[in-house]
């Protein structure tokens, strides 16, 4: 009997063009007006995006109204995405002259906990349901972070990027660097009471690591990832994108309306291919379909 395969869409739902954002400047959330087109495309294929939302987006009434409508129709899920630098409570970290934005794992444990509680409560208050799925800002996880997520009732995380080393992505404090996932695999694991469902990334000799993440130039590579993942033992395929990448000028990758049209051309191709062999599910729904994973939370 052929094993059932599931397609999980994860969207880091955050402010506009954070790649080029500078501290002290206004942080826009205009991309909230550009999410409906993507959701409609997902609906067309009966796919269910998980909008992993951060502080500024959950405080944006446009996003909340949009997501609530989709939640009521069971067309999406809302999980948590945490950017430590603008999520209360605020705590002054040491910094170097040339520093990056802070990772949550740079903060003392009690501050980490309070920031997680802040985001969890905000999402619950805005949507009427406590979030149970999560992705870390800047992909930064450690055992303490997993433990704190478990404390707050989270059941699944999707921050691990197999075969990818983020140590060149510096943090705020002197000498702090991002996580090294280069030795991680695509296998699901259980960490401090939380199920880790890694992003789908394929390691190849010729092209290095390949993601299911559109960048305008990688349609062929994405189709290859879809094909190889289907041939593998993995029962899920995980796509990722940022909400701001759905808006012209919302990212360095899709700067123009033409770039957005190319994005949707590629999305149509890969979604059609994926729909042949995969059933769309949200991240929480995927967990609920696997009783074994649920048992690990007890």
Predicted regions span which residues?
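Acidic (Asp/Glu)-rich catalytic clusters
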Residues: 36-47, 58-87, 150, 189-192, ...
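Active-site-adjacent pocket scaffolds in enzyme catalytic domains
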Residues: 135-231
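The substrate-binding groove and active-site-proximal loops of carbohydrate-active enzymes
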Residues: 20-30, 48-57, 100-112, 131-132, ...
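Metal-dependent polysaccharide deacetylase catalytic core of the NodB/CE4 family, i.e.
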Residues: 55-136, 140
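Acidic-and-aromatic substrate-binding clefts and catalytic sites of carbohydrate-active enzymes
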Residues: 26-32, 52-64, 86, 135-143, ...
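Hydrophobic faces of well-ordered beta-strands that scaffold small-molecule active sites
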Residues: 7-11, 49-51, 78-82, 132-134, ...
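C-terminal domain-boundary segment and adjacent tail
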Residues: 208-298
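Active-site beta->alpha N-cap acidic-glycine motif
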Residues: 2-73, 275
């Amino acid at each position: 009997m052929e094993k059932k395969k599931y397609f999980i869409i994860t969207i880091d739902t955050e402010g506009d063009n954070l790649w080029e954002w500078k501290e002290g400047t206004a942080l826009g959330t205009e991309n909230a007006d550009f999410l409906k087109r993507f959701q409609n495309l997902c609906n067309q294929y009966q796919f269910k995006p998980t909008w992993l939302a951060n502080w500024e987006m959950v405080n944006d009434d446009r996003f909340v109204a949009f997501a609530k409508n989709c939640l009521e129709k069971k067309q999406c899920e809302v999980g948590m995405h945490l950017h430590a630098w603008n999520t209360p409570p605020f705590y002054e970290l040491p910094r170097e002259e040339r520093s990056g934005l802070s990772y949550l794992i740079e903060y003392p444990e009690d501050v980490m906990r309070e920031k997680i509680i802040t985001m969890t409560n905000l999402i619950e208050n805005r949507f009427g349901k406590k979030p149970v799925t999560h992705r870390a800002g800047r992909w930064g996880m450690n055992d303490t972070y997993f433990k704190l997520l478990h404390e707050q009732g989270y059941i699944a995380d999707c921050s691990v990027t197999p075969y990818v080393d983020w140590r060149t992505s510096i943090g705020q404090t002197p000498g702090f660097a991002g996580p090294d996932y280069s030795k991680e695999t695509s296998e699901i694991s259980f960490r401090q009471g939380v199920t880790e469902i890694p992003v789908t990334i394929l390691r190849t000799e010729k092209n290095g690591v390949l993601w299911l993440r559109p960048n305008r130039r990688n349609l062929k590579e994405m189709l290859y990832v879809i094909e190889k993942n289907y041939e593998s033992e993995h029962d899920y395929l995980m796509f990722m994108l940022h909400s701001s990448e759905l808006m012209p000028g919302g990212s360095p990758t899709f700067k123009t309306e033409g770039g957005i049209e190319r994005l949707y051309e590629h999305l149509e191709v890969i979604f059609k291919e994926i729909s042949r062999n995969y059933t769309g599910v949200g991240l929480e729904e995927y967990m609920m379909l696997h009783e074994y994973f649920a048992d690990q939370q007890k």
